[in-house]
Structure formats: C-alpha cells, structure tokens
C-alpha cells in the first residue's frame, strides 16, 4: 500500500485477520481477500447466505483521527460500489443482493473490539 508505513500496514493486516475471524464466526463464507485491480482494493468479499457482502475493514489504535467507521467517506463508498461491479463482472459471480459492510476494529489494549456494520452504505 503506497504511502503507508510498515507499522500501519502491519496494524491493518492484523485488523483484517480479526475481521475475517469475526465474519467466519458469524457464519459468513469468505470468497476473496484483498482483491485488487488498478482502481483499488476490496478487503473481504463473503457470502452471508444468499447475500454477497463487500466488506471494508478499518483498524484504529486510537480515535485521534476519527473513528474507524468515519474513515469510510462517500468517495470510498462510491469506489467500493464500482470495484464490486468490476469483481462481479470479472469473476462471473451472480448475486441477487449485494450489501456493503464496514468492520471497525479497535486495538486499544486487551482483545480487539470488532464492530460489524451491515449495510453501511
């Protein structure tokens, strides 16, 4: 990830692993992680029953720069919609319903706190 320090990349990767464990425990079936194309990246793609969940993971150690969920701006939401359409087209996957979720991971000491906001946008 250009522009990110190695430490921030490590924190982000740890947060994504926490999010993945949370999703699996909640019964979702992951089908892709860190899917990339020239226009961006989708953190996690998973089936929640018949619904395809496009998951953005935001990890924070403090709220100094805002909450993890607040980091998903309108611009980011629009980009994720475009990326999801591209992933569906490239993989030939059919989904009657696509949902956009945000997983907020807070690392403030002790076990990670995971908040899963389904249908965030």
Curated annotation (Swiss-Prot):
GO molecular function, one term: nucleic acid binding
Top-level division of the source organism's lineage: Bacteria
InterPro entries cross-referenced by the UniProt entry: Restrct_endonuc-II-like, tRNA_endonuc-like_dom_sf, UPF0102_YraN-like
UniProt cross-references to Gene3D superfamilies, sorted A to Z: 3.40.1350.10
SUPFAM superfamilies linked to this entry: Restriction endonuclease-like
S-S bridge residues: none
A matching Pfam family: UPF0102
Family stated for the protein in its record: Belongs to the UPF0102 family.
PANTHER family linked to this entry: UPF0102 PROTEIN YRAN (PTHR34039:SF1)
Protein name (database record): UPF0102 protein Strop_1320
Organism: Salinispora tropica (strain ATCC BAA-916 / DSM 44818 / JCM 13857 / NBRC 105044 / CNB-440)
Lineage: Bacteria, Bacillati, Actinomycetota, Actinomycetes, Micromonosporales
């Amino acid at each position: 990830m250009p522009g990110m320090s190695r430490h921030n990349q490590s924190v982000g990767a740890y947060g994504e692993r926490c999010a993945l464990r949370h999703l699996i425990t909640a019964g979702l079936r992951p089908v892709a992680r860190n899917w990339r194309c020239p226009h961006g990246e989708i953190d996690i793609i998973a089936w929640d029953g018949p619904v395809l969940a496009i998951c953005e993971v935001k990890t924070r150690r403090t709220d100094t720069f805002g909450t993890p969920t607040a980091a998903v701006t309108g611009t980011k939401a629009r980009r994720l919609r475009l990326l999801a359409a591209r992933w569906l087209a490239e993989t030939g996957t059919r989904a009657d319903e696509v949902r956009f979720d945000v997983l907020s991971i807070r690392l403030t000491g002790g076990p990670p706190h995971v908040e899963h906001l389904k249908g965030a946008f």
